[in-house]
């Protein structure tokens, strides 16, 4: 079990939290993290591209000329693929690029990222994170007091915190159940509350 310092929103010490080694203390598996990111990005692809094959192109129902006797090559339709304006062969059609990944692998991926954050000292735990009103300036001040520079991922269910971060290019706020591998990898610092740590450990431990 690893102990990590807990801070308040002003950057002052507020005690310690014991992190579960089954979640925050495993050996990071980079291959599984990579596969999880590829799967996540594949699920975001639109897959709406479409071309017309010879049956979908307008026209071409009549045989251009008779089968024999003209000296020209036999043709059955002016919309065959070899014709200008003809249909496309094996072109893209609407499809879903999403695919499944075993639950154990998905959980191993997020646990690997969380463990790596702890190893790199990029994990910050707060006693609580609440805002009375959406104030971007207050959120920036809090991040400065926590020495959270660069790209920061905040895990919080507080709506005011989410609204306060909308205008900050390098800050993203996600709910506890929205924590994902791609965001955790793309953002340097990860800020959790003690409640968020408990919920994450309940699901992943």
Curated annotation (Swiss-Prot):
Source taxon at top rank: Bacteria
InterPro entries the record matches: Ribosomal_uL4 (IPR002136), Ribosomal_uL4-like (IPR013005), Ribosomal_uL4_dom_sf (IPR023574)
UniProt KW keywords: Ribonucleoprotein, Ribosomal protein, RNA-binding, rRNA-binding
Biological process per Gene Ontology, one example term: translation
Biased composition (Basic residues): 51-71
SUPFAM superfamilies the record matches: Ribosomal protein L4
UniProt cross-references to Pfam families, sorted A to Z: Ribosomal_L4
Keyword Kinase attributed: no
GO molecular function, one term: rRNA binding
Residue numbers spanned by region Disordered: 43-97
One GO cellular component, as annotated: ribosome
Subunit structure: Part of the 50S ribosomal subunit.
Physiological role: One of the primary rRNA binding proteins, this protein initially binds near the 5'-end of the 23S rRNA. It is important during the early stages of 50S assembly. It makes multiple contacts with different domains of the 23S rRNA in the assembled 50S subunit and ribosome. Forms part of the polypeptide exit tunnel.
Family matches, as NCBIfam families: rplD_bact
Family from the record: Belongs to the universal ribosomal protein uL4 family.
Designated name of the protein: Large ribosomal subunit protein uL4
Originating species: Lactobacillus acidophilus (strain ATCC 700396 / NCK56 / N2 / NCFM)
């Amino acid at each position: 079990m690893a102990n990590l310092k807990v801070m308040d929103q002003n950057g002052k010490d507020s005690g310690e939290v014991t992190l579960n080694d089954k979640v925050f203390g495993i050996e990071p598996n980079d291959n599984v993290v990579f596969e999880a990111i590829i799967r996540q990005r594949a699920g975001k692809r639109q897959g709406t591209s479409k071309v017309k094959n010879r049956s979908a192109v307008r026209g071409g129902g009549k045989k251009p000329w008779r089968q024999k006797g003209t000296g020209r090559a036999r043709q059955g339709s002016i919309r065959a693929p070899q014709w200008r304006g003809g249909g496309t062969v094996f072109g893209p059609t609407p499809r879903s690029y999403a695919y499944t990944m075993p639950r154990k692998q998905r959980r191993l991926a997020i646990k690997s990222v969380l463990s790596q954050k702890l190893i790199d000292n990029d994990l910050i735990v707060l006693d609580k994170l609440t805002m009375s009103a959406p104030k971007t300036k207050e959120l920036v001040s809090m991040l400065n007091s926590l020495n959270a520079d660069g790209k920061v991922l905040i895990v919080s269910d507080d709506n005011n915190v989410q609204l306060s971060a909308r205008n900050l290019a390098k800050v993203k706020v996600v709910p506890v159940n929205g924590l994902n591998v791609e965001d955790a990898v793309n953002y340097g610092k990860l800020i959790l509350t003690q409640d968020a740590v408990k919920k994450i450990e309940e699901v992943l431990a």
